[in-house]
């Protein structure tokens, strides 16, 4: 397997593609404490309802729940604290410009270890779907599944 393609996914936001139409994917680093890192290695992280927003010219990840590390002492972390994201300056300015447009949100899609064993987060620049859009995507998925069954049965 190529080094560039290696990803060990720790957490995934499964509802993201159902609730949002994702237009662009962005990879970012994330600043963590030691107890957060150990908790992520154990898989105790949830990306449900997590999103990124701009604060004082920086990007921060909000509502990402990383459980407290059981073996940590009194210096344990707060599970829902805002976490700073690491993105190149030009890319950050481009993202912030798009976020300020009406209807765009930066949501967390997945959290993973890259080939250098660094934790990265995949963010999606997305627009929220209306209820009728969600029903339409369910119909499309059902039809694609049905087509697969029909083609498989003919062979």
Residue ranges and their predicted role:
Residues 126, 134-151:
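Flexible glycine-rich active-site/ligand-binding loops centered on an Asp-His dyad
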Residues 73-75, 130-133:
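Short small-residue beta-strand/loop micro-motif enriched in glycine and branched aliphatics
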Residues 87-124, 128-130:
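Beta-rich strand-turn-strand
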Residues 9-104:
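Ribosome large-subunit tunnel/peptidyl-transferase-proximal elements
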